[in-house]
């Protein structure tokens, strides 16, 4: 069979490059279009070059030789991408036409909507234009969820301080304030007290002015205010060590939702995720409720052909509360870990759906496997504040080393990999925690509880050597 050609809009996020490009290139010819060259790391660029039959970079971002250099690491691209959505759509259509591609995909949250419009113009399978907008704008997303038959929650669009005051009066506290256009929990804030609410809103609103997003990202209001979803851990789990929310990965094919795998989580730092354990140990009844909620949510968004990453709060009486859903792959190593545990390559599966629709070998339900658990974990400054190695009042610090001591692993849990920020790395503690991952590690074991306990012990006992500054 002749290999089909897929256009990849290459940028940050989603399925990590170290898996995506090799997996995709095994079955498809890849053409990589890079709309934001400054958002590509050196290792990402090397993988793009290695596995693509052609690479197209947006020429408008090259002014000097320095612009051809790629950073070693990047979490969020802070340079400007000032092209309006229509111009981005036209560029995608142009590149797709040059190579007569059979499908278009991206791992980046911010290009979901322009990509959907390009797919529609070219007659290619995609998420769907309105559905992509629903999945990108959290106000539209919540409205779609509330219509879809999942748990309905109070919410209000917020642009101004007056809007926020009105939301406070209507919803009350505790209240969640979310930017409608970002990802990775950036800017998500829990408002607990009426007395400090306006100051919190002003702080977040001011801080988000420093977070650059492409001009092509559009929204009707920059924030959504929502009632807080209260979890009820003991109604779902029989053992300790996890969190009161999960994520579930799935695939949409011709408008039908196909669940793939559920990840358990360890407790968050605020709204910043700390670890994902694949697969979930929840019982069959719990999994069924989660799948039902995810199906209603993603089909309710109107999504047609795409990957989905859906986050669900585990509430009282086993009610599944929809947090949000994205029309893309999960980040971190959640997609590679599904392959490690189940042997299913979701990168290839998505491209199969985009090229062949329901002829792809879609799962008949959640994947099942012999007992083996893989955890994808990060350490943040807050962990070292909690274990007493960083003062609560520190404003920044310079890392000298981070080490995991012997004797912290439980059962047959093993460390598959560990990496930490290089010596000399400066960490600004005024940033949102999600920007400040300072170490990452992967664990593997035959018992999920032992893996979860090992994560906890590492968080409590990891050794940080650093120089820090205190406020004057």
Swiss-Prot record:
EC main group: ligase
PROSITE patterns, per the entry: ATP_GRASP
SUPFAM superfamilies: Glutathione synthetase ATP-binding domain-like
Binding site for Mg(2+) 1: 109, 182, 324
Catalytic activity: L-anticapsin + L-alanine + ATP = bacilysin + ADP + phosphate + H(+)
Amino acids binding Mg(2+) 2: 311, 324
Pfam annotation, one family: ATP-grasp_4
Domain ATP-grasp residues, every copy: 142-355
Names of the cofactor(s): Mg(2+)
Pathway noted in the entry: Antibiotic biosynthesis; bacilysin biosynthesis
Enzyme Commission identifier(s): 6.3.2.49
Keyword Ligase: yes
UniProt remark on cofactor binding: Binds 2 Mg(2+) ions per monomer.
Top-level taxon in the UniProt lineage: Bacteria
Site feature (Plays a key role in restricting the N-terminal substrate specificity to small amino acids such as L-Ala) residues: 332
Residues engaged in binding ATP: 138, 178, 184-185, 226-229, 268
GO MF annotation terms: ATP binding; L-amino-acid alpha-ligase activity; metal ion binding
Keywords carried by this UniProt record: Antibiotic biosynthesis, ATP-binding, Ligase, Magnesium, Metal-binding, Nucleotide-binding
Binding site for substrate: 273, 309-311, 328-331
InterPro entries, per the entry: ATP-dep_AA_Ligase, ATP-grasp, ATP_grasp_subdomain_1
Job of this protein: Part of the bacABCDEFG operon responsible for the biosynthesis of bacilysin, an irreversible inactivator of the glutaminase domain of glucosamine synthetase. Catalyzes the formation of alpha-dipeptides from various L-amino acids in the presence of ATP. In vivo catalyzes the ligation of L-alanine and L-anticapsin (epoxycyclohexanonyl-Ala) to produce the final bacilysin antibiotic (L-Ala-L-4S-cyclohexenonyl-Ala dipeptide).
Subunit-level organization: Monomer or homodimer.
UniProt name for this protein: Alanine--anticapsin ligase
Gene name tied to this protein: bacD
């Amino acid at each position: 069979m002749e290999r089909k050609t897929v256009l990849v809009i290459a940028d940050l996020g989603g399925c990590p490059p170290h898996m995506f490009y090799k997996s995709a290139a095994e079955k498809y010819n890849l053409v990589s279009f890079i709309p934001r060259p400054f958002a590509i790391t050196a290792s990402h660029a090397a993988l793009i070059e290695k596995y693509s039959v052609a690479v197209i970079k947006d020429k408008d971002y090259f002014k000097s030789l320095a612009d051809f250099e790629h950073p070693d690491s990047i979490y969020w691209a802070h340079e400007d991408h000032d092209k309006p959505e229509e111009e981005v759509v036209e560029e995608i259509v142009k590149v797709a036409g040059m190579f007569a591609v059979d499908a278009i995909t991206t791992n980046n949250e911010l290009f979901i909507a322009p990509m959907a419009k390009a797919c529609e113009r070219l007659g290619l399978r995609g998420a769907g234009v309105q559905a992509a907008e629903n999945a990108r704008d959290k106000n539209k997303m919540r409205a779609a969820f509330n219509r879809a038959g999942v748990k309905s929650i109070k919410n209000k669009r917020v642009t101004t301080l007056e809007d926020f005051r009105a939301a406070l009066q209507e919803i009350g506290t505790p209240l969640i304030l979310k930017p409608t256009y970002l990802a990775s929990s950036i800017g998500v804030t829990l408002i607990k007290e009426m007395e400090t609410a306006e100051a919190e809103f002003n702080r977040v609103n001011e801080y988000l002015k420093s977070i650059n997003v492409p001009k092509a990202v559009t929204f009707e209001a920059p924030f959504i205010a929502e009632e807080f979803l209260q979890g009820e851990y003991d109604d779902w789990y029989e053992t300790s060590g996890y969190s009161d929310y999960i994520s579930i990965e799935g695939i949409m094919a011709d408008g039908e939702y196909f669940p793939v795998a559920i990840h358990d989580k360890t407790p968050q730092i605020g709204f910043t995720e700390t670890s994902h354990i694949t697969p979930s140990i929840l019982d069959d009844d719990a999994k069924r409720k989660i799948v039902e909620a995810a199906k209603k949510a993603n089909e309710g968004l109107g999504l047609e052909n795409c990957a989905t990453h859906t986050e669900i709060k585990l509430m009282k009486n086993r009610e599944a509360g929809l947090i949000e859903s994205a029309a893309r792959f999960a980040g971190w190593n959640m997609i590679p870990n599904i392959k490690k545990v189940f042997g299913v390559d979701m990168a290839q599966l998505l491209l199969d759906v985009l090229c062949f629709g329901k002829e792809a070998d879609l799962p008949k339900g959640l994947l099942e496997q012999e007992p083996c658990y893989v955890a994808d974990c990060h350490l943040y400054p807050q962990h070292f504040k909690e274990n007493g190695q960083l003062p609560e009042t520190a404003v920044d610090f310079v890392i000298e080393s981070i080490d995991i001591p012997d004797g912290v692993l439980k059962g047959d849990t093993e460390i598959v990999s560990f990496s930490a920020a290089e010596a000399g790395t400066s960490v600004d503690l005024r940033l949102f925690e999600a920007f400040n991952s300072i170490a990452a590690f992967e664990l593997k074991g035959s018992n999920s509880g032992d893996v979860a306990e090992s994560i906890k012990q590492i968080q409590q006992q990891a050794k940080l050597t650093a120089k820090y500054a205190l406020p004057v």
